[in-house]
Regions:
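Membrane/wall-proximal cationic-aromatic binding patches
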Residues: 4, 10-18
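Alpha-helical cap/lid subdomain in secreted, periplasmic
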Residues: 15-22, 37-39, 47-56, 62-210, ...
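Contiguous, structured surface segment used for ligand recognition
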Residues: 32
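Short hydrophobic beta-strand that contains or immediately precedes a catalytic carboxylate
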Residues: 26-28
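Terminal, non-globular segments
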Residues: 6-8, 23-24
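Conserved helix-turn-beta segment of the N-terminal RecA-like "Helicase ATP-binding" lobe
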Residues: 44
């Protein structure tokens, strides 16, 4: 698939015809993921994969993964898409009480995320995790200086991405999908609409959802043997 193959509305129509016989995909996020789930389902359908989707409750990632009796495990997914967005990470970072805590933000967040992966993997062995790495937001405060300032959010976010890649490689059941790279294909202004985040907690615009949904569908297709791709 390519980012120009389908519009979001076309993917939404495709998703309505999916019977869920080929793959079971759960989507967990600390932001709104309803439209993302639709884009994934429609993108899978475009690749010939009928996907059953579970769009879990808003901002219930840890609760769903920690509880063995949650609807996540009752759904028995083949793939779990986990999205911990940069906007919520920024809120947590800004709430850190001192520079000392900010200097270790990436390490602590990576450890927490890896623990979630391990918990899910232990309760749902054989399932694949597709973790959406955070896209870098606009930093009008520190600018380029933030890239070499360890206590800045941009520095910690870049470090977090590296640590998550290392943790995912060690665990073996994680595919790390870099939203920063996808955002670079279409530009930040096209990928992210700040108005939609503050209105509906949506971090990916409808215009960019086909790109993201297609990237996730490509991973699902590769893992199911329907496509050749380095996952």
């Amino acid at each position: 698939m390519t980012e120009t193959s389908y519009t979001y509305n076309e993917l939404r129509r495709l998703a309505k015809g999916s019977d869920g016989n080929d793959a079971r995909i759960a989507v967990l996020g600390d932001c709104s993921t309803q439209h993302l789930s639709t884009a994934i389902c429609g993108s899978c359908k475009a690749l010939g994969i009928d996907a059953a989707m579970l769009d879990t409750e808003f901002d219930q990632v840890r609760a769903m993964i920690d509880d063995p009796c949650s609807e996540l495990y009752a759904f028995a997914p083949d793939h779990a898409v986990i999205y911990l967005c940069a906007e919520k990470l920024a809120e947590r970072f800004c709430a850190e009480p001192s520079e000392k805590e900010r200097l270790t933000f990436a390490e602590r967040t990576a450890a927490e995320t890896a623990a979630l992966w391990q918990r899910f993997s232990s309760l749902r062995p054989g399932a694949r995790i597709i973790h959406l790495g955070p896209a870098m937001p606009y930093d009008g405060v520190t600018g380029s200086l933030g890239n070499t300032t360890p206590s800045s959010f941009s520095y910690q976010l870049r470090r977090l991405s590296l640590l998550l890649c290392e943790a995912g490689a060690a665990l073996g059941c994680v595919t790390y999908l870099d939203l920063e790279a996808l955002q670079g294909q279409v530009g930040r202004d096209s990928f992210y609409d700040p108005r939609m985040y503050y209105i509906a907690q949506m971090t990916v615009s409808d215009a960019a959802l086909p790109l993201l949904g297609g990237a996730i569908a490509d991973i699902v297709a590769a893992c199911s043997g329907r496509a050749l791709k380095c996952v």
